[in-house]
Amino acid sequence: PLQQLNKLSDETPVLIDLKPTGDHYMEDLFKAGGLGVVLRELKPLLNLECLSVTGETLNERLQSEAAYVNREVVRSFDQPIQKMGGLVSLFGSLAPGGAILKRSAADPTLFESEGKAVVFKSLEDLANRIDDPDLEVEAHDILVLQNAGPMSDAAMPEAGYLPIPKKLAQSGVKDMIRISDARMSGTAYGTIVLHVTPEAAVGGPLSLVKNGDKIKISVKNRSIDLLVDEAELDN
């Protein structure tokens, strides 16, 4: 369950300095010592009695020291890049089944936010209107994409990385809260809430969001709520 994700993420530090949150690339991790280095640092959190494909336990596999470690790429356990993991799951009236935010790639100034929804009913609707100069949207609004989950006609494409509306991008806006039942590339950066469940296509609360509705997000409280009367959601 997603509640377990929060527990694991809160206990597991970010040790690898890779894009989009860092400066290096995957090949740099390989040259810095690879996953073996990372696993050795994470030993306090691992079940070391698990068997590997060689028949050895994980502990036995990690006994030997790495020949080389580049600490600019892989930090030590006691000197992490971030003390908590990159993912956090959010729950509330907008996502009773949960949603996921990659906090390590998000803007911390948006972690506690309340804003007005700007809704796109589908990928086609998004494509047709996102760059419209007459789109009613401001930097503190929250973009919402519906019907992009696994049960939708779109079948959950990597569409969660909603573009910043052209009129805002031209004024210098680099990030804003974006919410959908879609997914996105692991290399994407932004304050983007994904995998909202239940999804819009099966009648989840996401499908009920209208332009102008208020949405509140709190990473601290692990919450994401649609601020309308419960009776309206029930109907």
Which residues does each PLM region occupy?
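Catalytic or ion-coupling anion/metal-binding cores of large enzyme and transporter domains
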Residues: P1-A200, G204-N235
